[in-house]
Every structure is written in structure tokens, then in C-alpha cells.
Design a protein with these regions (language model features):
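His/Asp/Glu-rich metal-coordinating catalytic cores
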Residues: 1-36, 72-73
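Accessory terminal helices/loops
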Residues: 37-51, 58-144
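Short, conserved beta-strand edge motifs with alternating hydrophobic and charged residues
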Residues: 14-15, 52-55
């Protein structure tokens, strides 16, 4: 369940659906295909300035996963440095625009992400569709 506030500064209270630099898991219900549809059909279409307020703060660990999948993501490297130094009482707040740059689950067309998936899964073809990339990333993240 997510709540979108459409004020001067749009904000998304996204519970366990979207995390800073990550995506929710489907262990307690839901399906990765449905989560993909939420990301592609709803979250990615929000204005870039939309502030993100997830239910939990896993940003450092999620950025480490991003860099495992996309080691050349300079924006994620810089944000990880900031996240590791953050005051726990003043957590970083990201935006949809920043998430599109650092969140692997929004970076489904990245050549590096796709190449690394092909190394991990023999059944990922040369031009996987975004849903396949998302579902395979979610599978990797489940055991990462």
C-alpha cells in the first residue's frame, strides 16, 4: 500500500513497495510480476521531484546491491558514501528522480545491469525485456 501526497512538494509514503535504492520482496504475499507492473506502470511515472518515504531504511545495503549489479554507477557510489555517514536520526530522503539513477529496479535498460544478469542466469537472452530483468534482479536480491 502506498500513499501519494500531491502537495507543492509531492511525497510518496511507500511502505514495503519501494525502498531507497531497492524494491520490496514478495515473501509474504504478492508476486514479482505484479511488483514490476507497479514500478513500471505507476512509480516510474511519478514526477521526478516526488520525495520517497519508505517503511524501512535499507539504503546502504540496497546501494551495495546496486553496485554489485552495476559497478560503474557513479551516482550510486557517491550516495553510498553519504548514506554510510548519515545520522540515523536524520535519514536521507531520496526522490523518484534520484531513484531512477541509483535504484537497480528502475535501471532495467542499463547495459551493465543486463550483462551482469546474463552472467548470473544462462536463460537471460541478448535482449531481455524489462520485466524479465526486474524479476531476475528480484530473484538475485532475495538471496544476496
Amino acid at each position: 500500500v502506498c500513499l501519494l501526497s500531491r502537495t507543492d512538494q509531492p511525497a510518496l509514503f511507500c511502505g514495503d513497495t519501494l525502498f531507497n535504492a531497492g524494491a520490496g520482496n514478495c515473501h509474504n504475499g504478492g508476486h514479482p510480476n505484479e511488483l514490476y507492473e507497479t514500478f513500471a506502470g505507476q512509480l516510474a511515472k511519478l514526477p521526478d521531484e516526488t520525495m520517497i518515504y519508505p517503511g524501512h531504511d535499507y539504503i546502504a545495503n540496497n546501494l551495495q546491491f546496486t553496485l554489485d549489479r552495476e559497478p560503474d554507477n557513479e551516482k550510486a557510489k557517491a550516495l553510498l558514501g553519504s548514506a554510510e555517514k548519515q545520522d540515523p536520526d536524520a535519514a536521507l530522503v531520496t526522490t523518484i528522480g534520484l531513484e531512477k539513477e541509483v535504484n537497480t529496479f528502475f535501471r532495467l535498460h542499463s547495459p551493465t545491469v543486463i550483462c551482469r544478469l546474463q552472467e548470473a542466469f544462462s536463460d537471460v537472452g541478448d535482449n531481455p525485456d524489462p520485466k524479465t530483468v526486474f524479476v531476475k534482479l528480484r530473484e538475485l536480491r532475495n538471496s544476496w
